[in-house]
């Protein structure tokens, strides 16, 4: 390839959405990629789900709805997920999944003018190591140091997180021309970073409800503190295998939880279910898409003390005991009482983190310099 191009490297996005970083990548595809000066090529370091698999999954769900197991909400979900691959990922953006052609994937990295990491692995991989002198930017979605110490802070014997190496995070911060931190607060990383917070668009703005059931729509990694829900009436939307990990490794009692296997396309359906309080007390939370979503859907959150601590909010918890205490206080609130907390919080978050145009322009200044 003789044409000059920049590689944008990711480990997720498109139809592979397992968390906030993948949402960030999809926002980048839609909002940033069309405005890049140098030809962009998106490389996704994963094996994509085939159309046949996606179609089969959708058909199974649709059959369940037709059999009366989904109701009106289910029928609406079916309408939303009848999308093919081209609609999930903008095909005007040249892209390649590593699983489709590993050799070409490697060659494209080698031939790039620059490499911009949108969301990388948290440990070294040869594809990046052998091209690290080309890294122009690296977007940091979570602090490895914080993730690794979460179990100690929470006084837990074991920890659930992806493969991580602190030295790799440090090295990427050193070699990247632009190390970018996306959290709501300034970075506390070892090396200086540029602070470009994510954005969230409030599109639902739903009213609160009087339901005292708790909802949890996050991964089950240790810093998310899912064990705070032990013994509480809860609806949990997450990876079911990871629930098993908590049961088997930390003897977490999940008998009071109603469990739903996470699939991103069903998120809206889950958020509209009958629950009114959000477990959003995730320690070391960088941005917190799930927190923004909870507030957007009218769920009153219990937050961690370290999430936007400058915002005056009474319902915060850093332990199971504190979580139960805050839960009881919220249960005593009237609907109007809940509105008094949710609506001002929504207004603050929208004002502070809701400007997509500002986010886009800041990103483009880095990529187009």
Residue ranges and their predicted role:
Residues 264-265, 277-291, 305-313:
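Nucleotide-sugar-dependent
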Residues 145-147, 166, 178, 182-206, ...:
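Short beta-strand->alpha-helix junction loop in the catalytic core
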Residues 8, 180, 201-224, 233-234:
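Conserved donor-binding/catalytic core segment of Leloir-type glycosyltransferases
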Residues 1-18:
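Nucleotide-activated donor-dependent transferases that construct or modify glycoconjugates
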Residues 11-16, 31, 35-93, 242-243:
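N-terminal strand-loop element at the rim of the active site
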Residues 299-304:
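Short hydrophobic beta-strand element within catalytic cores of glycosyltransferases
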Residues 240-273:
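Conserved active-site histidine-acidic residue motif and adjacent donor-binding/catalytic loop
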Residues 20, 332-369:
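A charged, aromatic-enriched C-terminal amphipathic alpha-helix characteristic of glycosyltransferases
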């Amino acid at each position: 390839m003789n044409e000059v191009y920049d590689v944008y490297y990711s480990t997720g996005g498109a139809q592979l959405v397992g968390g906030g970083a993948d949402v960030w990548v999809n926002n980048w595809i839609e909002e940033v990629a069309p405005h890049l000066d140098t030809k962009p090529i998106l490389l996704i370091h994963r094996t994509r789900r085939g159309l046949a698999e996606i179609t089969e999954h959708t058909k199974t769900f649709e059959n369940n709805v037709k059999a009366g197991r989904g109701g009106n909400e289910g029928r609406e979900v079916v309408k939303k997920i009848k999308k093919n691959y081209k609609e999930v990922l903008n095909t005007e953006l040249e892209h390649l999944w590593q699983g489709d052609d590993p050799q070409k994937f490697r060659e494209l990295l080698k031939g790039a003018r620059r490499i911009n990491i949108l969301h990388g692995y948290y440990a070294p991989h040869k594809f990046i190591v052998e091209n690290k002198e080309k890294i122009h930017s690296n977007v940091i979605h979570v602090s490895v140091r914080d993730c690794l110490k979460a179990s100690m802070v929470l006084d837990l014997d074991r920890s659930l997180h992806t493969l991580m190496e602190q030295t790799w995070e440090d090295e990427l911060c050193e070699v990247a021309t632009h190390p970018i931190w996306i959290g709501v607060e300034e970075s506390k990383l070892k090396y200086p970073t540029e602070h470009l917070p994510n954005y969230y668009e409030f599109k639902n703005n739903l009213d609160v409800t009087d339901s005292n059931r708790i909802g949890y729509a996050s991964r089950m990694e240790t810093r998310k503190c899912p064990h705070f829900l032990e013994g509480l009436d809860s609806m949990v939307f997450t990876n079911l295998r990871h629930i098993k990990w908590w049961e088997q490794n930390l003897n977490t009692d999940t008998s009071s939880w109603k469990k739903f296997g996470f699939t991103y396309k069903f998120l809206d359906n889950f958020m509209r279910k009958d629950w009114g309080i959000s477990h959003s007390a995730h320690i070391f939370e960088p941005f917190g898409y799930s927190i923004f979503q909870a507030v957007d859907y009218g769920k009153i959150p219990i937050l961690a003390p370290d999430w936007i601590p400058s915002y005056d909010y009474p319902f915060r918890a850093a332990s199971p005991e504190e979580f139960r205490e805050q839960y009881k206080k919220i249960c005593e609130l009237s609907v109007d009482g809940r509105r008094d907390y949710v609506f001002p919080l929504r207004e603050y978050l929208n004002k502070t983190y809701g400007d997509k145009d500002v986010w886009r322009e800041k990103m483009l200044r880095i990529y187009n310099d």
